[in-house]
């Protein structure tokens, strides 16, 4: 899996970790501008450690554990520069991007995964009859 091929659920979790870190930084230092951090997030060793120690990321995107802080910065910058379809680039923040991937993930669940689970459950139920 290359860096640009992370699924929406993986991107969403990384963005959530990143957002939590930005909020924490602003709470510690009132001089920081949260609006600026949402467009140009601080990605440091703490963010990297949180990503690398996350069990979900370990299972679903093991390559995250091999990323450096610099690679993670590049990755997030890439996602921000890709933006969101039909949304002006200047309106893209880590929150709007997370919302986009959240919505995308919900659609994936509704359109692909839930029908598959229902079908498999029905097959199992039919076998038990």
Curated annotation (Swiss-Prot):
GO terms for biological process: chromatin remodeling. GO terms for cellular component: Swr1 complex. It holds the Pfam family SWC7. It comes from the Eukaryota. It is found in: Nucleus. Component of the SWR1 complex which mediates the ATP-dependent exchange of histone H2A for the H2A variant HZT1 leading to transcriptional regulation of selected genes by chromatin remodeling. Component of the SWR1 chromatin remodeling complex. Belongs to the SWC7 family. This is SWR1-complex protein 7. It comes from Candida glabrata (strain ATCC 2001 / BCRC 20586 / JCM 3761 / NBRC 0622 / NRRL Y-65 / CBS 138). The gene is SWC7.
